[in-house]
């Protein structure tokens, strides 16, 4: 295996040049931009793209000076993919757990002072369509001081979702739904933090306060 860094396709070499030397080319560049919600209030202070937050806590030099308001008790993460789960875990983990990770030092200090105690993960689709993987969703239940809360009605499949699940006949997909339904059967135990999953909900507006800061979200 050979690694070549600091190479920009289209600047240092072209796709045609790559094709001339390799039989197979795999593009794994990652998502560099976020999908906007296109709702009123999206540009208020306190509303951030996931890529900014992830780059910040991972220590990307272009993002280390970003400021995130962690003084509020509740935060919402819109999306039900692995990135959403990663963001939610960072917000929910204790400082002791974060210390064992490779999180940037400045992000650790900011999160150590965080007052966020409730994190909502909001999905526009249902549990069958959720994009997160089973290891990711299972790991949230292993965090030290977090109650994972899933409303039972939202993981009770309607006929269309059940038909899709049966049609796919995918054991991994069945297991994903089972994990969510297991969380739904658990009663909260009074832990310091709560991670709440909501399905089939769509943000329609972010409402700001007199300072232009996000105050609440309308679904």
Where are these regions (language model features)?
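A short acidic, often aromatic-flanked loop/helix-cap motif at beta-alpha or helix-coil junctions
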Residues: 9-13, 53-56, 155-158, 204-205
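Flexible loop residues that form catalytic
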Residues: 30-31, 80, 124
């Amino acid at each position: 295996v050979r690694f070549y860094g600091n190479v920009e396709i289209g600047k240092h070499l072209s796709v045609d040049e790559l094709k001339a030397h390799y039989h197979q080319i795999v593009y794994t560049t990652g998502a560099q931009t976020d999908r906007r919600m296109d709702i009123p209030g999206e540009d208020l202070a306190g509303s951030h793209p996931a890529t900014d937050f992830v780059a910040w806590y991972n220590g990307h030099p272009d993002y280390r000076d970003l400021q995130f308001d962690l003084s509020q008790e509740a935060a919402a993460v819109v999306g039900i993919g692995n990135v959403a789960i990663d963001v939610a875990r960072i917000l929910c983990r204790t400082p002791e757990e974060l210390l064992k990770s490779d999180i940037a030092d400045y992000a650790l200090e900011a999160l150590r002072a965080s007052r966020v105690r409730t994190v909502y993960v909001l999905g526009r689709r249902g549990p069958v369509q959720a994009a997160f993987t089973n290891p990711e969703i299972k790991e949230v239940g292993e965090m030290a001081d977090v109650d994972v809360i899933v409303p039972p009605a939202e993981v009770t499949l309607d006929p269309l979702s059940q038909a899709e699940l049966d049609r796919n006949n995918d054991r991994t997909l069945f297991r994903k739904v089972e994990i969510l339904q297991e969380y739904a059967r658990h009663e909260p135990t009074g832990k310091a933090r709560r991670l709440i999953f909501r399905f089939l909900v769509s943000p329609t507006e972010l409402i700001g306060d007199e300072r232009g800061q996000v105050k609440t979200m309308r679904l």
